[in-house]
From Swiss-Prot:
Ranges of biased composition (kind: Basic and acidic residues): 252-271
Subcellular location: Nucleus
Pfam families in the record: CCT, GATA, tify
Main location group: nucleus
Upper lineage: Eukaryota, Viridiplantae, Streptophyta, Embryophyta, Tracheophyta
Keywords: Activator, DNA-binding, Metal-binding, Nucleus, Transcription, Transcription regulation, Zinc, Zinc-finger
Record domain Tify: where: 33-68
Gene Ontology cellular component terms for the protein in this record: nucleus
Coiled coil regions in record: none
Family from the record: Belongs to the type IV zinc-finger family. Class C subfamily.
One example GO MF annotation: sequence-specific DNA binding
CCT domain segment(s): 95-137
GO BP annotations listed: regulation of DNA-templated transcription
Record protein name field: GATA transcription factor 19
Length: 271
């Protein structure tokens, strides 16, 4: 025979094996109901309204009327908004804190061209000076090395740099615009030989190189004397030509005064 339903109209209790998860969920809901009082708290325009007692079914019905989402039975759904509010408040607080830190850092930043005199002062104090002024590398090298051997080595290096010769044609570095790199290394060829070596990879024949010699001061004085003598001869020649021209001017004027006879005079002479 089928089991008759109870008189109160309630469902009979299910067996232990058939209850399963439903019993666990009902137990959890009863525990939450007993732990939290059935109070409804509403906050509207800064005012707080508390209603006691309010069952969850009424709250769900009100939310459905207002167009909210459907709530599951039990108070578990009522605890979700509180946790969401807590998360939102913590996120907002973190944002405010990060914004304050950013503003503090931005105050320290300066995108304008600020002259830092302290750094300039340190750099100026580290720089070498000569007679109260900033000295370059060349001046500092000349002034710092006051001893005789050091000065002699520096002068020897300068002379070696100045007095180099082309290894191909033998021309001096003073007679070429610049010494260039060659097969033997830097500053081993003259300008012409270095350019040919860089462009074609071959060295020009020394026979085509111009023969240029350095003139000594005695030779320069001799050439200067010869130039002066040539200049004096040219000046004397110009003076003699000017004198001859002035002497010939009166004769030319006399010839210009003697005019040739006209046609009328010729006809009268013939008649």
């Amino acid at each position: 025979m089928a089991a008759e339903p109870p008189a109160d109209g309630r469902d009979p209790p299910a067996d232990d094996g058939a209850a399963g998860d439903g019993a666990v969920e009902s137990a959890a809901a009863e525990a939450l109901l007993s732990a939290a009082s059935e109070q409804l708290t509403l906050v509207y325009q800064g005012e707080v309204y508390v209603f006691d007692p309010v069952p969850p079914q009424k709250v769900q019905a009100v939310l459905l009327v207002l167009g909210g989402s459907d709530m599951p039975p039990g108070l578990v759904s009522m605890a979700v908004p509180t946790t969401f509010d807590e998360k939102s408040t913590t996120v907002a607080a973190r944002r405010v804190a990060s914004l304050m830190r950013f503003r503090e850092k931005r105050k320290e930043r300066c995108f304008d061209k600020k002259i830092r005199y302290s750094v300039r002062k340190e750099v100026a104090q580290k720089m070498k000076r000569r007679k109260g002024q900033f000295a370059g590398r060349a001046d500092f090298g000349d002034g710092s090395c006051s001893s005789a051997p050091c000065g002699s080595t520096a002068n020897g290096e300068d002379d070696h740099i100045r007095e180099t010769h082309c290894q191909n044609c033998g021309i001096s570095s003073r007679l070429t615009p610049a010494m260039r790199r060659g097969p033997a290394g830097p500053r081993s060829l003259c300008n012409a030989c270095g350019l040919m070596w860089a462009n074609k990879g071959t060295l020009r024949s020394p026979l085509n190189a111009p023969k240029m010699t350095v003139q000594h001061p005695a030779d320069l004085s001799k050439t200067g004397d010869t130039d002066d003598s040539k200049a004096n001869l040219c000046a004397e020649h110009n003076q003699t030509t000017m004198k001859t021209d002035t002497e010939m001017v009166p004769e030319q004027e006399q010839k210009a005064d003697v005019l040739p006879p006209t046609k009328e005079e010729d006809s009268m002479a013939t008649s």
